[in-house]
């Protein structure tokens, strides 16, 4: 196989010469499949060499652990504004050279003038210990009004087969241009933060699950320093302030009848600081293929956002499905004119289809009040290699 034997041995948590444990043997298939390296893992076969000594025979079929994910969206013309395309490219190299190391890159064009990039690396089992470390860099160019850069260092400790905790330290820098500063009141700032989180994952497949639960939550605390421009640092502006950021992701997958599955996802984000009005650069974005279908990418912003994804799926195969969906979103933000909060509903249908080029995805979503031909089309391609 491509995956090195030492990687398999450390993941099954059984050492050579260890006393036989039926409980550990029963966990082998699940542990290896959750890595995402293998297409198939057979049940271990116990054999004896002499007396009470023996071994385990493991048969695995190497999978395609690296992925290319591309999405193309089209926002139709509205009034005097012409329609335009949006796009996303995700490249994930999972199990580099069979070592379990991972490298990923991301690029996204959200609208005419906004794009972001990111790069991440993960080193598993640092120095042979069950300790995974990683780091990342990201940059967002938002509407030509400001640039946001993030650096982070992460540590993950597996506690159980499906449960792990994470810790993170990072730095965020906001660099507005003159338009962002004087028209929108954005300040040049630097934030140092630390976060802790927990993750639980019992899904039977990462790309097309039929059953299981995924849960992740993080709590981040930071110290923000506003640096300028000097004319905007008035007495009403706090030079230094504390920040808190909370995230929650919860997903359920339940089979109902043969090939029919209900998928529910609940997601929430909240940002709190000592500032009366949270700057645009600290707000969360809502809308688009991965949050609220039927609306443009990042169409809404708020210091608090939440969305519910509901899908009724018909399972077509290992990597294929068709579905009906309804997405319900909420966002709120404190503005100079008062508090703004709204609920949004999107609905539609879509499919994921395994082809020779990869997994093709297409969602057609309508926002509440849209006519039948006025929806948003989200097209994507996931290629495993």
PLM regions with names:
Residues 34, 49, 73-80, 182-328, ...:
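C-terminal outer-membrane beta-barrel translocator/porin domains of Gram-negative envelope proteins
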Residues 14-19, 339-342:
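C-terminal soluble interaction/assembly domains
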Residues 18-216, 285-286, 299-302, 359-385:
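Gram-negative/organellar outer-membrane beta-barrel architecture
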Residues 306, 318-322, 343-347, 355-360, ...:
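A short pocket-lining beta-strand/turn micro-motif at the edge of beta-sheets
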Residues 309-311, 337, 344-352:
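Short glycine-rich, acidic/polar surface loops and turns
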Residues 6-11, 22:
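Amphipathic alpha-helical coiled-coil scaffold segments and their short linker/junction regions
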């Amino acid at each position: 196989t491509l995956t090195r034997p030492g990687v398999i041995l450390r993941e099954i948590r059984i050492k050579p010469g260890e006393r036989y444990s039926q409980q550990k043997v029963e966990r082998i298939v699940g542990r290896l499949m959750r890595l995402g390296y293998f297409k198939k893992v057979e049940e271990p076969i116990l054999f004896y060499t002499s007396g009470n000594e023996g071994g385990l025979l493991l048969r695995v079929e190497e999978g395609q652990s690296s992925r290319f994910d591309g999405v193309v969206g089209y926002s139709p013309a509205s009034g005097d504004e012409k329609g335009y395309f949006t796009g996303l490219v995700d490249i994930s190299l999972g199990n580099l050279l069979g070592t379990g190391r991972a490298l990923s890159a991301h690029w996204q064009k959200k609208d005419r003038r906004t794009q972001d990039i990111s790069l991440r690396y993960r080193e598993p089992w640092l120095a042979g210990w069950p300790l995974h470390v990683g780091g990342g860099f990201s940059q967002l160019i938002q509407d030509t009004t400001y640039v946001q850069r993030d650096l982070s260092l992460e540590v993950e400790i597996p506690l159980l087969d499906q449960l792990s905790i994470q810790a993170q330290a990072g730095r965020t820098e906001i660099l507005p241009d003159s338009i962002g500063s004087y028209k929108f009141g954005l300040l040049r700032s630097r934030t140092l933060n630390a976060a802790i989180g927990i993750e639980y994952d019992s899904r039977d497949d990462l790309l097309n699950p039929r059953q299981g639960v995924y849960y992740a939550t993080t709590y981040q605390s930071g110290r923000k320093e506003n640096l300028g421009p000097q004319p905007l640092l008035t007495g009403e502006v706090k030079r230094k302030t504390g920040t808190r950021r909370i995230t929650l992701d919860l997903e359920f997958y339940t089979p109902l009848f043969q090939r029919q599955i209900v998928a529910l996802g609940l997601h929430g984000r909240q940002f709190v600081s000592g500032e009366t009005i949270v700057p645009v650069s600290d707000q969360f974005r809502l809308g688009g293929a991965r949050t609220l279908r039927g609306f443009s990418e990042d169409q809404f912003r708020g210091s608090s956002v939440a969305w519910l994804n509901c899908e009724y799926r018909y399972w077509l195969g290992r990597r294929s499905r068709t579905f009906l969906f309804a997405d319900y979103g909420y966002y709120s933000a404190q503005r100079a004119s008062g508090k703004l909060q709204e609920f949004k509903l999107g609905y539609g249908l879509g499919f994921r289809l395994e082809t020779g080029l990869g997994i093709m995805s297409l969602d057609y979503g309508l926002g509440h009040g849209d006519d039948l031909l006025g929806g948003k089309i989200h097209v994507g391609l996931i290629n495993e290699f």
